[in-house]
Amino acid sequence: MRTKFTLSALFLLIVCNTSAQFTLPDMVFEPVTPITVYLTPIVEGVYDEPREFNNFLKRDQPAYVHTTPPMHYKDNVWQQSINAEKTPVLNQLLNFNGIGNTNVSPPDPSGEAGQDYYIQAVNGASGARFRIFDKATGNPVGAAANFSTLGTLGSGYGDPIVIYDAMADRWVLSEFSANGNKMNFYVSQTSAANGAYWGYQFTTPNFPDYPKMSVWPTGYFFTSNEGAPPLYALDREKMLLGQPATMQRFTVPAMAGFGFQALTPVDFDGTNLPPAGAPAYFARHRDDEAHNPGNNNTANDFIEIYSLNVNFTTPTASTLSAVLKIPVSEFDSDLCGLTSFSCITQQGSNTKLDPLREVLMYKVQYRNF
């Protein structure tokens, strides 16, 4: 059971605690012209060949080293007992089966509910596979389909993300490509999840491992694991119209001790929009005993917040800022060291699980109350 906690008044604090650290985009990409694509269902009852989905192409890279060994203090957020749930259990509205086993491990499921539909996506042998469900009944709307059948963007490789853009009543699907360092994005042309999509393919300088995506009024944003953590801004306004769209890339300093590391984009949810002109946000945690040994705070670790003011008309006016370090209770990132992907034991199996110590879990959600 995981401890639940709340970061209170997070974005109110950001307004009052901006810093002077600014970063311009280190790469501005040429406009990408979309193609129009349509859903092509796969044949029901045909299963993929068993395989392990190896998306660790960039996860086993050398860690950013420091000269002082990591230090350890009491982990105050380590929950060692089961607490009774303090809130009543809500009545279940709907329960239905999603996509079946594709014989791919891990499945990396992703899903999102919109006004009328729910879309689920998982890894398949030929890249990501998704299926659309009626949100009122749970009934499938057509057969499952592979992302790569949506058009001529080439073969997909997985790590799907499904996003519902409530501000525009549109759907956005993404996965990385099997051909080079590319990300494939599909934006629905209408609110119909089973209608036509615009397909965009953006090339990144490195393989975009562990991609995570967010929606914000000023753009679509995604992060990935490419060494020094990058974040990308996509021209949402152009993509919603099916027009040629550009991408900008920014990076933040890597943290010593980790090899695999990535920011998590903050996704807008709810009905009250962020304040006009509010920047997009990105977050990560910092265990300063692990990343700053010998020069650390023994009472707290931190959540770091970055803000991005993106300007697609004048890219040199775009700025990424480190705006806030939120003190939180001490926690310990040393789980079988700082780089092992095989650590957590499980009953009845000799296979150990990846502790995923390096990243904040997706999604990090923004609500404006």
Per-segment meaning from a language model:
Residues 1-23:
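Bacterial Sec-dependent N-terminal signal peptides
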Residues 21-369:
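C-terminal PAP-associated
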